[in-house]
Amino acid sequence: LQQLGVDVIYLNPVFVSPSNHKYDCQDYDHIDPHIGKIVEDCDGLLSPGDRDNSHAAKYICRVTDKRNLEASNKLFQELVEEIHRRGMRVILDGVFNHCGSFNKWMDRERIYENQEGYEKGAYVSADSPYRSFFCFKDQNLWPYNPSYEGWWTHDTLPKLNYEESEELCKTILEVGKKWVSPPYNVDGWRLDVAADLGHSNEFNHRFWKEFRKVVREANPEAVILAEHYGNPESWLLGDEWDTVMNYDAFMEPVTWFLTGMEKHSDEYREDLYGNSEAFIGAMKHHMRSLHMGALYGAMNELSNHDHSRFLTRTNHRVGRLSYAGAEAASANINPAIMREAVVIQMTWPGAPTVYYGDEAGVCGFTDPDNRRTYPWGKEDLEMLDFHKRMICIHKAYPLLSKGSLEFLWNDYQGLSYGRFSDDEQIIVILNNQEYERDVHVTAWKTGVSRKGAAAFQRIMISSKDGYTEEAEEYIAEAGILQVRMPAYGVMVLYHGAKDKYK
């Protein structure tokens, strides 16, 4: 990761959980020993056909034994220290809208019921200290009351009942504080389905204001970013979230334009494929919802744990693992389109965020196929090298982090935009067609004079035949750049102090 050029590592949930995705938290206070450290173990796997998890002795030992939990927290502490030593930062995933049915507060699986040192869960007993943490529809079903509210009716994801429990609010605020404080010292939180927390918009805002206050008092530099679909303006007023995962003003417009695919690979739309007018319109509309600080810090992703891999979307195949099969996700993919997307990602306003494996050519339909293991020893080395080079360009030119944005040219399957300041310009040109063509770009919109000639240096070009950083000069005459663009091509040009960034 350090060699790739990563500055921040955002970890999907790492707390105790029975699943591989871990968005069904079992214990917010401890790192899962299965990805941490197991120092005490025992026999006792479930027998074939046995669905009673209270019989899973081996699992119960691993996730309830304090020695395993403490050792795992210690290992995580050491990991964060090493990440910081290498000049990188760490963001944790906070799943606070709901927990899992395995959670010690609920204990539907009766894992904690007979374990020393644990209170009875709210599912198990009406006298549980955690009863108010959840909303039970029928008060007459204890012991083992299954009538609790589930997020989107999922009984494996009990929704947390904040409005009725001051103790729950206090507990989650302590969790938020704990992990950004010594000895763990993480650098911020990504908040899962943040707008869903609570049962009213009013309470939701009140809680996140308090969360921000507690977290920032513990760590003034901690970032707070949220998963959110739709307009986030009311949460971005400076007292709740810092920014968001940028679906509306990045992932969706980019994937529709370059691939015509919906981000789960559930739909193909010919009317949006290559439609640069729709791309520009969507970007302008949704970027207005983000103030400058939120926009420049927004997580610009091509793929993530909830959606299909971008490289898979380049095959224009509607499908899911359940009926299309894993091999279909990598059939007829187009790495050149992936490189176009990576260039946009690394030159667009915001924080480019690479989902593990995208840089190595990993394919996959939506969850769970998008969570394949990293292909150690089988990486697409060309894609990996391209990511390294584009990350290097992103970090080398401050324009790409702070510069203004202007659209310069567009047509069907074609787009150009500029990032610029008073004395420097970067121009990106894309041709998403399967054949080469000439384009004329209005470079003057970035501040280049229309009265003479301006020399732009090419710093990256990619096409269906590969890519290169080999320098080549392009002259803008009277503020117009004329460029021959290759098939499935993208070019990055720079004008300014010629040797400034060497």
Task: Show the residue positions of the predicted features.
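Extended substrate-binding grooves/exosites of carbohydrate-active enzymes
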Residues: 108, 114-117, 126-130, 138, ...
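Conserved, mostly hydrophobic/aromatic
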Residues: 1, 11, 28, 83, ...
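Short, solvent-exposed turn/loop segments enriched in Gly/Ser/Thr/Pro and often Arg
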Residues: 10-21, 93-103, 192-198, 227-232, ...
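Short, flexible loop/turn elements at secondary-structure junctions
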Residues: 15, 32, 96, 164, ...
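Carbohydrate-interacting/catalytic domains
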Residues: 1-8, 16, 334-335, 347-354, ...
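Substrate-binding/active-site clefts of carbohydrate-active enzymes
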Residues: 3-7, 14-183, 211, 217, ...
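Conserved alpha/beta catalytic core and glycan-binding cleft of carbohydrate-active enzymes
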Residues: 102, 208, 212-213, 221-368, ...
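Loop/turn elements at helix/coil->beta-strand transitions in domains of secreted/extracellular proteins
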Residues: 4-9, 84-91, 184-189, 219-223, ...
